[in-house]
Amino acid sequence: MEQLRGLILSGGKGTRLRPITHTSAKQLVPVANKPVLFYGIEAMAAAGIKEIGIIIAPETGEEIKAVAGDGSRFGVQITYILQDEPLGLAHAVLTAEPFLRDAPFVMYLGDNLLQGGISELVERFRTNAPEALILLTPVPDPENYGVAELNGSNTVKRLVEKPKEPATDLALVGVYMFTPEIHTAARAIEPSARGELEITDAIQHLVDAGRRVEPHIVTGWWKDTGRLEDMLEANRLILENVEQRIDGELDAASQVEGRVCIEAGARLVRSTVRGPAIIGAGATLTDCYVGPYTAIAEGCAIERAEVEHSILLAGSSVCGLDGRMESSLLGRNVAIRRDDRQPRAYRFMVGDNSEIGIL
């Protein structure tokens, strides 16, 4: 099999992560202080894939270009491919056909995370040479995913996109491997009821044509980070393996417990950080507590507050809370502070599609 190329899908509107995605691509929201998109690029690079195409949308494409660059920082070459409208994963494959040409390729959904990378799967695809290799995992809510029915354990019988009555609980993970046969299949299908060219229909076309579609049941964790709860869970899973490193400054009254990464330029004053956690460069923690599974990005400031199981994006600040903030995601340059003046009251300025929880 010739050299594989990579295709990462980074379009879409990210409606489930609003209001964060009103101002940023969902694939650039960080998990453990690294954009989700970067995990997919790094997984492809580790598998020996050198040429990667990234599908972008008109609304967020320039931001993704600016952040990911030409790929040199990852040891790969990135080509950006504009998809004018989000008309389905199979439509994205057809949009990328001039880049992919006749090469086999790995398709990776840019807001997905997969434990252990894809190196072994790529090697299996090269060795077994099926027309497609799909990844599956049992989920409690298969009606929200593409679902597979198998003949035994080694062949695919049927694929259905978001079925109302799923026949199995095996959901398609957002990583696929294809030969160029998928282009022919994608051109042969019709749009679904929701007006999209579904990748499940294209793969089903391969099955119906007698092509070999090989399933692989994922044994490690997989996360689609499209919702807040999934983003926080992905952050927790990644931080489980955070590297213990203290490059920032701690005063004598501060302490660090467990696996904590404190990047250069970060400063702790009379504060406690209990890992696993990561504190970004230039962040300042004063008279505060940061609990497990928290990622504080660069330039954040926390003062007289407690934060746990949360993600704070760059430049955000939390000051003077008299309770613990947990299970939260703060966008860039967000400020949360308490005014001690009387009478005490809540004062908000909240954008469309926001959510505030007061416990």
Residue ranges of model-derived segments:
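Left-handed beta-helix
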Residues: 1, 155, 181, 188-359
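Conserved core of the sugar-phosphate nucleotidyltransferase
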Residues: 114-190
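Active-site glycine-centered loops adjacent to acidic/histidine catalytic or metal-binding residues
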Residues: 12, 111, 138, 227
